[in-house]
Amino acid sequence: RAAADFLATVNLGSKPQWEFPLSPFPRPGGRATRVIYTEYDLPRETIEPHDVILDKDGFAWYSNFGEQNIGKLDPKTGKVTEYQVPEHKPGFPTGFLALRADRDGDLWLGNMYQATIVKFDRKAEKFSYWQLPKEQNIDAAQLNMVSPQSSHVDGKVWAQNNGFAGVHRLDLASGKIETWEPFKTAKEPHNIYDV
């Protein structure tokens, strides 16, 4: 509480007092503080889970930071099933960061230095891929975050490119990827972390 009270006094604005008073929620207690942690063994020591999400059926899906696969863990049995993603740029680093689901529960990933947007259809257990156009598919291209959450509205999936601070928009109907580089003429380096 003392730290929160102090931080609430820090004001670098032109007004002498914040317009929004500090109103912290009460600390949780009782049942809200009971937590059970369960650890699961993965099939190889080299697996580096980055993001983990639960689907509506209770399976835990993870992106693998250092390898070209995603994994599905059944928390009831501990069984892990891996799905191999082919390389699209042999010789470039592999792996994934963000793992997100669309409204249908299908999984989307940015295949980092492979410069590919990846969709995994959970029911069919099949991948679809969209590789960046040649002019953006440079050595530094790095697709980390893919955002399909509103793709059911307009058929568009957004992605960010950490390699050159770009934003991509995939049109699912045509497969065309549009690119914006808002910091292309900036004098200092910039980055776009997420969309």
Set out the residue ranges of the language-model regions:
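Short loop/turn segments that connect beta-strands within beta-propeller blades
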Residues: 74-78, 121-125, 171-175
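Periplasmic c-type cytochrome electron-transfer domains
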Residues: 1-12, 23
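A short loop-to-beta-strand structural motif that recurs across blades of beta-propeller domains
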Residues: 69-72, 115-119, 165-169
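A short beta-strand motif characteristic of beta-propeller blades
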Residues: 38-42, 79-89, 126-139, 176-185
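A short helix->beta-strand "capping" segment at the edge of beta-propeller domains
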Residues: 24-46
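Short loop/turn segments immediately following the C-termini of beta-strands
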Residues: 65, 112, 122, 162-163, ...
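Conserved beta-propeller blade signature
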Residues: 59-62, 106-109, 156-159
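Beta-rich, blade/repeat-based domains predominating
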Residues: 45-57, 88-104, 135-155, 185-195
